Regions:
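Residues within the DNA-recognition helix of helix-turn-helix
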Residues: 30, 51, 169-172
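A short pre-motif secondary-structure segment
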Residues: 141-145
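A short, charge-rich alpha-helical start-of-domain segment used by transcription regulators
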Residues: 2, 6, 12-36
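Structural recognition of an alpha-helix C-terminal capping motif at a helix-to-coil junction
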Residues: 36, 50-57, 61, 70-82
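Amphipathic, Lys/Arg- and hydrophobic-enriched alpha-helical face
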Residues: 25-45, 62, 131
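Hydrophobic topogenic segments
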Residues: 96, 100-108, 115-119, 132, ...
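Arg/Lys-rich amphipathic alpha helix in sigma70-family domain 2
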Residues: 64-68, 81-99, 172
Length: 226
């Protein structure tokens, strides 16, 4: 059985050749990932739907330029993030607050903290509150670095900022996160849970629970037709 990456690559190749059905199938296969990526930057469902529609229009218009079809989904994520950032800039809005998770992805790989997160509503709520209270311009860096596994260099190139700026946002974000988490967790049953893997587990949990609304899933026709 082909992997999702392989199947997406085949669909992208067919779409690049102009096959209409492939565009519809490619949209259906990637819209959940694209939707979650957009939620890393935008909070309004209306804004997300608009940004996704434009992102897919751009992706489909230039799909023939994609050198490696199997990398379509990763390429699409970059388009979505850039389009969401453009949307914020053009509409005079601010990026919803973000967070840095320090260390490396290996810090939590293989841990069972996702299970703890799933079964601990109080911990999830506390982490969500902390994440939403942090300074702006960090959430995107956090998710790209820690959940999406992008390197500092890749984040810098994607966001059009220096690597030093990325590192600075991550550093100060983590300090704030750790301070607020320590204060919020005192006296609670999850006191002592390491904040870095806990937030990483939360991001993975939320990604698994994230589902694109019907209004987003059903715009295929207008995207392809455009």
């Amino acid at each position: 059985m082909p992997t999702k990456v392989e199947e997406t690559g085949r669909l992208a190749l067919r779409a690049a050749s102009g096959e209409q059905k492939a565009f519809n199938e490619l949209y259906a296969a990637t819209v959940e990932t694209a939707y979650y990526t957009a939620t890393l930057v935008l909070t309004s469902q209306e804004d997300i739907a608009d940004a996704l529609q434009i992102s897919y229009m751009k992706a489909f218009a230039h799909i023939g330029e994609l050198e490696h079809p199997e990398s379509f989904e990763k390429w699409l994520k970059k388009i979505v993030i850039n389009e969401c950032r453009n949307y914020l800039r053009d509409n005079g809005k601010h990026i919803f607050s973000t967070v840095y998770i320090g260390g490396s992805y290996d810090d939590v790989e293989g841990s069972d903290l996702t299970v703890d997160i799933a079964g601990n509503e109080e911990l999830r709520r506390t982490l969500d509150e902390i994440l939403s209270s942090l300074p702006e311009k960090q959430r995107v860096c956090v998710n790209l670095f820690y959940y999406e596994k992008y390197s500092v260099a890749e984040i810098a190139a994607l966001l059009g900022i220096s690597e030093g700026t990325v590192k600075s946002r991550l550093h100060y974000g983590r300090r704030t996160l750790e301070r607020k988490y320590k204060r919020s967790s005192e006296g609670k049953r999850f006191y002592g849970v390491a904040v870095v893997p806990a937030v990483a587990a939360l991001l993975a949990y939320k990604a698994g629970k994230s589902s694109a609304p019907a209004a987003v899933k059903n715009v295929t026709g207008s995207v392809v037709a455009a």
